[in-house]
Amino acid sequence: RIDQAGRPHHLLYHLARAGWTDIMLIDRSELTSGSTWHAAGGFHTLNGDPNVAKLQEYTINLYKEIEEVSGQATGIHLPGGVMLVSNGDRLDWLKMAHARNRYLGVATEMISVAEAKKVFPVLDEKQFVGAMWHPLEGHLDPSGTTHAYAKAARMNGAEIVRKNRVTGMRQRPDGTWDVETEQGAVHAEHVVNAGGLWAREVGRIVGLELPILAMAHQYLITEEIPEVVAFNKETGREMVGVLDFKG
């Protein structure tokens, strides 16, 4: 496995748990030193692909297991989340997404804007026409979660090699691979390109041109909002996350 970011550690853990103990993850630097260290850490299950939505729900439910297995905190918080829409077309889309989620066993619920305001009291009801609620939404510590996966994978027999850049790969006639690294060659039956942001460059080592492009996302960090602080203090719980779909 040639690694970058948190997802490869997720896969490494599952392979090790399934009995693949002779596996190695090769990281060119330190764990979480790529895009993970500055990730916002938010998560939700709403996705245009229903299979991805179901996979996201599975992963969210897995975080507590990873904490228990590894003893490493993930910093997970599950206040729940509300998806809001501001027009009829988007409301139709949200209803479709809800129906698809329920078919797959994802426990979303259509709620009124008034009900949404009860869990997100700073909401301006006049701006929206509908909402969907899901309890498995929130945020976590990306770095802590990655290290929890890594520790759990090691406990199941996996090996992680850090500060070891891959410099080349060559396939043998029998289909196995020689992976050249800065610390020497590794002979592998299978190679997983988990390079994330650099997966295209890793693919080019063996002549593959992967259609991967980095997308610039953004998040906003604010000062404390008095209304949010007051809500959290008065209710003893965290105000939910909100997504606004304007089309």
Residue ranges of predicted features:
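Beta1/beta-strand and adjacent pyrophosphate-binding region of the FAD-binding site
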Residues: 1-8, 24
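Glycine-rich FAD pyrophosphate-binding loop
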Residues: 16-37
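Residues forming the Rossmann-fold NAD(P)(H) cofactor-binding site
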Residues: 9-10, 200
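Gly/Ala-rich phosphate-binding loop of Rossmann-like dinucleotide-binding domains
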Residues: 12, 16-17, 152
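Residue-level detector of alpha-helix initiation sites
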Residues: 5-7, 30, 197
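Flavin-dependent oxidoreductases
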Residues: 169-247
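Flavin (FAD/FMN) cofactor-binding and adjacent substrate-gating region
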Residues: 65, 86-162, 167-175, 180
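Dinucleotide-binding Rossmann-like beta1-alpha1 core, especially the glycine-rich loop
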Residues: 41-119, 239, 245-247
